[in-house]
């Protein structure tokens, strides 16, 4: 499980040093792809393969499923961390997420999210106050 927030920097080649806590789970390979809210999702290869199998179950006649798969998979890039725990974030994905140098790497359970640091901070400023004001459970039985 991926937990916590880390604030590394991308180097001049667009490489990210994975947080040490995440490396063991990503050592055998990972997939970086477009996420929602203009972040990137990073999945361990096995988790991505499981998700892909679920996506394949959607009927080809379902336009929303086709659209989602196109957007999600067309930006996907499989990567293998080097000995220093670095992975290259492809230029297409860096542009999509507005990544320059300062980034936030957040644990989101079964996935890691990669955000531009300022965008992440703005997102938290907007969403976090409402977190405590919820009258109903967002995740029934959990919170």
Swiss-Prot record:
Name of protein: Transcriptional regulator MraZ
Summary of subunit composition and partner proteins: Forms oligomers.
Gene3D superfamilies listed in its UniProt record: Transcriptional regulator MraZ domain (3.40.1550.20)
Upper classification of the organism: Bacteria, Bacillati, Actinomycetota, Actinomycetes, Kineosporiales
Gene encoding the protein: mraZ
Keywords for the protein's UniProt record, in alphabetical order: Cytoplasm, DNA-binding, Repeat, Transcription, Transcription regulation
Organism of origin: Kineococcus radiotolerans (strain ATCC BAA-149 / DSM 14245 / SRS30216)
GO molecular function, one term: DNA-binding transcription factor activity
Assigned protein family: Belongs to the MraZ family.
SpoVT-AbrB domain segment(s): 5-47, 76-119
Transmembrane intervals: none
SUPFAM superfamilies: AbrB/MazE/MraZ-like
Record-level GO cellular component terms: cytoplasm; nucleoid
A Gene Ontology BP annotation from the UniProt entry: negative regulation of DNA-templated transcription initiation
UniProt xrefs under Pfam families: MraZ (PF02381)
Keyword Iron-sulfur: no
Main location: cytoplasm
Localisation: Cytoplasm, Nucleoid
HAMAP family, per database record: MraZ
NCBIfam families (alphabetical): division/cell wall cluster transcriptional repressor MraZ
